[in-house]
């Protein structure tokens, strides 16, 4: 962007691990363009929750999908993975479709009891479906992920996939001939849920798009502004300590002895290189735990519910006056890695990362290569330090400019993917979907947590009574999608009720 067992997190944010010459594992940083490994919509391994699920009605299958919905001359198809469950279906009930996003899907979202979508399905008597996004998980539309093939990867194609799927399922299951279809999603797929309703109102009756960044933006400087503000909101003392630490890192980078201290503190696999790209890649590694903790703080998703929260994973260390500023950063990094199950040295090899991302097979780099492609060709979403407020707080406005990420587009996919192309693509995305201010649709619910950095690109207000933003005080990314917990705030509880009430009103209006 979806209380779960404590083992959930390790599989949700699986880290890319390589063998190091010293026999110590190399841990590649977890956050890539705001996306943790496994995707932004947290999902546990089914083995950890299967004992809580009734699988009698859960079906996993594939659907013959069109490769190019906009050029019939291509004439190719592929097998798209999907899941469905009619456990809660009642005659005349609606169909709920969870849209896959930038990671693999599983039967979790159609079967796990107590989730927002399954609770709503039980209330409305809905048949629940989940379709995996092309080029993610086991859905491989082409033989590899070369640039010519990646041109079939876009949100527009994914929306047409959903439309074709709805038509096919309506034909396959006569019970659904007159069903009202509701699309659901979280994070990128939350935006997809809203856009699918907008592009296909004849097929999609309503949408619930949780934490959907419906505004594309090249220089997403607001992301780190929200990280700063969310930590400050938790504790001004903590925030002062965090920025003190980041600015100390900037100072230590200037000397050989300082860089040695940083290598030891952050347990780096390599010496810090002073070329521009390597330094920026190092900064991404430093920021990554803070970004991920804030993005999911308090979500009822494994360790983020209690351990990886702003209070426990960040401020608990930064208000410890017995530690030095550098020790505090180290303690946050060590604790994050320990809880997440990441053991080994932190890999800061920029060139190695680019080589990893250039892998064209459906292998270890699959989801990262696909998601970065979409940022380069549609969305931007580049979490920069260019903000006049957040930049200095994070140790320097030039530490991570948007251009750094654009240069990665060029390095990974080729010279055609340059600044002009990225900006043109982002402008087109906003024109095609309407951006935040011109969503041309109705009957969409748009929940957002106000400590989530992604809410800055969401739709938070609306003059249209049938476009319903639900801003949830003190919650993070996709918080509404998970199961209710005793730790939930009244704001989150009330938001889930609001979503349920609005959707109920729409479904029974006619």
Swiss-Prot record:
Residues of the active site: 187, 452, 477
Keywords in alphabetical order: Glycoprotein, Hydrolase, Protease, Serine protease, Signal
EC nos: 3.4.-.-
GO MF annotations, alphabetized: dipeptidyl-peptidase activity; serine-type exopeptidase activity
One Pfam family, short name: Peptidase_S28
InterPro entries to which the protein is assigned, alphabetical: AB_hydrolase_fold, Peptidase_S28, Ser_carbopepase_S28_SKS
Signal peptide: 1-19
Gene Ontology BP term (one): innate immune response
Glycan-linked positions: 234, 473
SUPFAM superfamilies for this protein: alpha/beta-Hydrolases
UniProt KW Phosphoprotein keyword: no
Protein family (similarity comment): Belongs to the peptidase S28 family.
Protein's name in the database: Putative serine protease K12H4.7
Organism ancestry: Eukaryota, Metazoa, Ecdysozoa, Nematoda, Chromadorea
């Amino acid at each position: 962007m979806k209380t779960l067992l404590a083992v959930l997190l390790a599989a949700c944010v699986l880290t890319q691990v390589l063998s190091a010459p010293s026999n110590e594992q190399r841990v590649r940083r977890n956050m890539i363009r705001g996306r943790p490994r496994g995707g932004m919509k947290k999902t546990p391994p089914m083995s950890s929750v299967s004992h809580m699920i009734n699988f009698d009605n859960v079906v996993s299958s594939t659907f013959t999908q069109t490769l190019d919905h906009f050029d019939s001359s291509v004439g190719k198809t592929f097998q798209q993975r999907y899941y469905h469950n009619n456990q809660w279906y009642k005659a005349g009930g609606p169909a709920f479709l969870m849209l896959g996003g930038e990671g693999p899907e599983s039967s979790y979202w159609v079967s796990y009891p107590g989730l927002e979508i399954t609770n709503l399905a039980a209330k409305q008597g809905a048949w629940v479906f989940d379709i995996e996004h092309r080029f993610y998980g086991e859905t491989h539309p082409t033989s590899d992920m070369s640039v010519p093939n990646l041109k079939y990867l876009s949100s527009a194609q994914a929306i047409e996939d959903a439309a074709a799927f709805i038509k096919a399922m309506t034909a396959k299951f006569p019970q659904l001939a007159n069903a009202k279809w509701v699309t659901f999603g979280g994070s990128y797929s939350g935006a997809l849920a809203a856009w699918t309703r907008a592009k296909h109102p004849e097929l999609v009756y309503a949408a619930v798009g949780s934490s959907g960044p419906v505004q594309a933006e090249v220089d997403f400087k607001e992301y780190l502004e929200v990280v700063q503000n969310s930590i400050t909101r938790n504790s001004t003392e903590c925030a002062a300590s965090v920025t003190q630490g980041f600015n100390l890192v900037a100072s230590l980078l200037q000397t050989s002895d300082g860089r040695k201290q940083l290598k030891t503190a952050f347990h780096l696999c390599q010496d810090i290189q002073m070329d521009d790209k390597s330094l920026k890649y190092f900064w991404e590694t430093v920021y990554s735990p803070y970004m991920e903790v804030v993005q999911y703080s308090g979500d009822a998703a494994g360790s983020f519910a209690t351990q990886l929260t702003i209070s426990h994973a960040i401020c608990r260390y930064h208000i410890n006056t017995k530690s030095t500023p550098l020790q505090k950063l180290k303690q946050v990094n060590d604790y994050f890695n320990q809880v997440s199950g990441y053991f080994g040295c932190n890999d800061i090899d920029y060139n190695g990362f680019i080589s990893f991302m250039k892998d064209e097979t459906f292998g270890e780099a699959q989801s990262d290569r696909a998601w970065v492609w979409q940022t380069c060709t549609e969305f931007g979403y580049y979490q920069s330090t260019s903000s006049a407020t957040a930049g200095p707080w994070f140790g320097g406005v030039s530490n991570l400019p948007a251009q750094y990420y654009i240069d990665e587009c060029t390095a990974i996919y080729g010279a055609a993917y340059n600044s002009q192309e990225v900006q043109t693509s982002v402008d087109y995305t906003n024109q095609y979907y309407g951006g935040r201010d011109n969503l041309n649709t109705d009957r969409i619910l748009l929940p957002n947590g106000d400590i989530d950095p992604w809410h800055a690109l969401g739709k938070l207000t609306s003059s249209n009574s049938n476009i319903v933003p639900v801003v949830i005080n003190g919650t993070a990314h996709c918080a509404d999608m998970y199961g209710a917990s005793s730790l939930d705030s009244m704001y989150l509880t009330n938001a889930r009720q609001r979503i349920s009430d609005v959707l109920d009103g729409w479904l029974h209006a006619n």
